[in-house]
Amino acid sequence: MKIASIDIGTNAIKSKIFKTTPASIEFIKGIRSPIRLGGDVFNDGNLSEGKLDQVIETIREYEEVFKENSISHYEIVATSAFRDTANSEDARRYIETAINHPLRVISGLEEAKLIRFHPKSNTGKSKIFVDLGGGSTEFFIRNEEETVIRSFQLGAVRNMLKRDEKEEWQRLEEWLQSIKSKKRLIGIGGNIRSFLNSQGSKEMSLNEFVKKSERLSKLDTEEKIKKYKFSPDRADVIDHALQIFKFIAEQLEIQTITSTKWGISDSIAIKLFHELYSSKVTIS
């Protein structure tokens, strides 16, 4: 059986398709559509009807792909932009009515908690997962005693549009200072992954990360597109994402920075996988 997930993010909409059996789940295909909801939300406070219609059109395109793959089980979630827009509930209903499928707007803490489905979330103590999106940044740390999750309203699109607040930076700094230093930062999201790929690296030391990200920041958007083949919606926000990663890494005295292809759409699919197959188990 194949299943799928759709993640309506702040900078793009993404979907992933998986092949499953009762004992396994395997990634097949991913789709990404550069629809920036954060522009409406952080500039105007609301998601416009035109932008919502773009979301609907995109979901319908994904659903056609699902039909071609005989997929009837899929989940749709929305994150920071949908959380922050003043018309969140009306926007959700508008989309649900059009597509005849539930849309779940998840909180920042739920977004952080979903990182637990990452296959390496249980291994090693001295690492921190940082999921940096367009509108928010989520953290996941698993210690022997507890799991720590946090969410902050700092993100690549939000910061680019100067909608980040000094108080939120202070809140982040205070929290980072309250936790033990970590050796390894595992970055989640297209910006950190694209940056490392553009530099031909799977991981970097903090010093190398700082030097190369500063070098990148000296290029304008067009130069980034030409030299590194970044998409336009990546090239204009990547410096802002890397600035947040740099701040976090320096506060925690991180030794190495790496990335993962994992994202919310993976976690949502894994969660759906468990729900579907556990429902087939009978208890007598």
Question: Predicted regions span which residues?
Answer:
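Helical "lid/coupling" subdomains associated with nucleotide-phosphate turnover
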Residues: 17, 40-71, 79-117, 121-126, ...
